[in-house]
Regions:
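Long, C-terminal-biased catalytic regions of enzyme "large/alpha" subunits
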Residues: 1-79
Length: 79
């Protein structure tokens, strides 16, 4: 399954990237894994990273709202 990046390039969907970003925001490992699994099931070939980010943020807010801003900060500051 391919993900379309902001610049139009494509890369293979990587559930571990989602899990790692959730962990970086302070979510518990089991919650991060759960979100990764849910996104793997929701994603489709050609999904854009922008849509994935919205889905991830919504899942984080439902699981642990205190981590939502940390995740946003992490996403904005990663290189």
């Amino acid at each position: 399954m391919q993900v379309v990046k902001k610049d139009g390039s494509k890369e293979e969907f990587d559930k571990q990237k989602i899990i790692n970003s959730c962990l970086s925001a302070g979510l518990a490992p089991d919650v991060a894994e759960k979100i990764g699994n849910e996104l793997e099931n929701l994603a489709y070939d050609g999904i854009e990273t922008k849509e994935l980010r919205i889905l991830i943020l919504n899942k984080i807010r439902k699981e642990d709202s205190s981590c939502a801003q940390k995740w946003i900060d992490y996403e904005q500051n990663k290189t």
